[in-house]
Regions:
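Boundary/linker segments of alpha-helical solenoid repeat arrays
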Residues: 83-87, 150-151, 179-192, 201-202
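Intrinsically disordered, low-complexity, charge-biased linker/tail regions
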Residues: 5, 131-137, 194, 199-213
Length: 213
């Protein structure tokens, strides 16, 4: 199935998370200084390094250097993994002086993760041989933390259709269409999904006719 338009949907808005502003009394990307508990300076530095890597990935994405952008996003996610409470909480009893993020830092961590996974999916859809399983995986990670994200719903739908599950793909694309009812690519892939479901239904009917009669 042709992939025209699947990768570039929303590209006119640029990569996710581009152009963050600083607020009064805040550090880079709006993260407040201090107040995060043991190891806070190291955690702050690691968080800001991840934000920087994501920004570098965004620049590479805009330059169509998708492979290099993927590397930057992966590096950002690796840095964030060491700070993610979902990952580090089970280890707190074994590791002394584990940094505890402030609520604002944790929000920045999560939004940076979401942006990186969204942008990784976009990069993968630009490659000559698309890894649709990975596109779906990344898009579902976005939806876990940012329910209703239209780009993630759309990409999950495209990937799921390509992986041979038009019924589930239709669910994702219908949700995406509620957020972007006039988007040409969403409507295109929703139509392709309906055609695939109709074709599968006709094949099933023909199979049963052959079996019984």
């Amino acid at each position: 199935m042709a992939e025209e338009g699947a990768a570039g949907w929303g590209a006119e808005l640029g990569p996710e998370g581009a152009g963050s502003e600083r607020g009064p009394g805040e550090g880079p990307a709006g993260c407040s200084r201090g107040g995060a508990g043991p190891g806070a300076p190291e955690a702050e530095a690691q968080l800001q390094e991840a934000v920087l890597r994501k920004a570098q990935g965004n620049e590479l994405y805009r330059d169509r250097r998708y492979r290099a952008a993927i590397g930057k996003y992966h590096r950002a996610l690796l840095l964030l993994r060491g700070l993610d409470p979902e990952v580090t909480a089970p280890m707190r009893s074994f590791v002394a002086q584990r940094a505890v993020l402030s609520a604002q830092q944790e929000a920045l961590l999560r939004s940076t993760q979401v942006d990186c996974y969204n942008n990784l999916a976009a990069c993968l859809l630009q490659r000559p041989l698309v890894d649709y399983a990975r596109v779906r995986e990344y898009s579902l990670r976005v939806l876990r933390w940012r329910e209703g994200d239209v780009k993630a719903l759309y990409r999950a739908g495209v990937a799921t259709l390509q992986l041979g599950d038009p019924r589930t793909a239709r669910q994702y694309l219908l949700q995406a269409s509620r957020g972007q009812p006039h988007d040409a690519n969403v409507r295109k892939y929703l139509r392709l999904t309906e055609e695939r479901l109709s074709s599968d239904h006709e094949r099933e009917k023909a199979l049963y006719r052959g079996m019984f009669g």
